[in-house]
Amino acid sequence: MTIIPRNQRSEPRFCATIRSALVWPIALAAFVFATVGWAEDARKGTVPEKEVQAKLQYCKVCHGVSAQGFRGYYPIPRLAGQQPTYLENQLQAFIEHRRTNNVMFNVAHSLSPSMVAALAANFNALNPPPLGGAPRQLVATGEKIFQDGLPNQDIAACAACHGPDAAGAGLFPRLTGQLYPYVIDKLVNWGKERGQNPKIPDTSAIMSPVAHSLNKSQIEAVAAYVSTLK
């Protein structure tokens, strides 16, 4: 595997390489275009600000008053600063059972596309400090994996899709400041929660080989690194 220098990395180049290895690249492309179209349709409508604020307060009961996430027995993700397109896509994924979570299915299926777009925009505008709590001794190792990948395991750099600052772009989520235990839980259980509807191709397939190839200590290191970023 050839490692792309940091100053030459670009999302399209890396993702094209990953997608070319998938057995259904055309279906994946169709899904991406459909998702973008759904998001565009969502923005055409309007929702009264009072309703948006009421729904935001409902979301913050679990995700935190500043959407910073919740670090408990069941870690709940940080939504603050998240890419709007990604948030819209994930809510749609819950509705279509591409991603499994009974609580979020019940929340998402009651939302109109216009409300989803409004919520995503509001969460994107928030920027509270990270909650922290990750083992500091893992951060340096996590940074190296995130920025350079693991060539001996044929694992590309996380930064190639998520960006060198982990800010994400479009359908690729922002990982900056994401909760340490949440990142671990999602990567360890990736195949159990993502891509669950075979009739609807899902971009989660891009991450599947990466999540399955990382061992627990490597996952913990990457999670520690991104959780410290601001």
Question: For each of these PLM feature ranges, what is it?
Answer:
Residues 1-20:
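N-terminal secretory signal peptides that target proteins for export/translocation
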Residues 21-34:
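Bacterial N-terminal signal peptides
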Residues 37-56, 68-73, 125-152:
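Electrostatic cytochrome c docking/interface patches
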Residues 49-52, 66-96, 105-110, 159, ...:
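Gly/Gly-Pro-rich "capping" loops immediately C-terminal to redox-active cysteine motifs
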Residues 57-65, 119, 155-165, 222:
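The canonical Cys-X-X-Cys-His
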Residues 65, 164, 200-204, 214, ...:
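Residue-level hotspots at or immediately adjacent to binding/recognition sites across diverse folds
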Residues 69-72, 100, 138, 154, ...:
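N-terminal alpha-helical segment
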Residues 109-132, 141, 181, 209-230:
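C-terminal capping alpha-helices of c-type cytochrome domains
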